[in-house]
Amino acid sequence: REYPAISGSVPPHLTRGTGGPTVPAISDIVFDAGFSSKAEAESYGVRPGDTLVPDSSAILTANGKNVISKAWDNRYGVLMVSELAKSLSGQALNNELYVGANVQEEVGLRGAHTSTTKFDPEIFLAVDCSPAADVFGDQGAIGEGTLLRFYDPGHIMLPNMKDFLLTTAEEAGIKFQYYCAKGGTDAGAAHL
């Protein structure tokens, strides 16, 4: 039988400054088919030594609970922001709203520098795709809610913004996780 899976490892930009290798060793690569336990994987017939064949399409996991796709970062954020823009279309707002997709975040926040210089926003929300690192015993578990990134090396969220987001999530019944990141987002350029 065939089951979709995704390969993963700790991204190189999250190991920066740790003294660890910048390219993962083969033994550091994990394959995740979305099963919640070894027993569940075995119940589907998965065994050590099974053959893996690369596939880059977007698909559901065998248990139907998750989506597998390559390069989520930052496609997921763009999808969320475009859906938000559609839902606000035609509504009267008490402010000016600019929605964009910045480029070259991983190599110096270049797009964010350009857009924040041009528009000089009073509030900037960076919608990004943070890693679900629960496989590696770290923070960010799939299915446990959105990650509220309150700190990363390039940005510390203002306390009032953090309180606003927490209150909004709690009042709306939105599941969230606290997230302290090793890598940064476009918010690092926006707050300067």
What residue spans do the PLM features occupy?
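N-terminal hydrophobic/helix-forming segments and targeting peptides
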Residues: 1-192
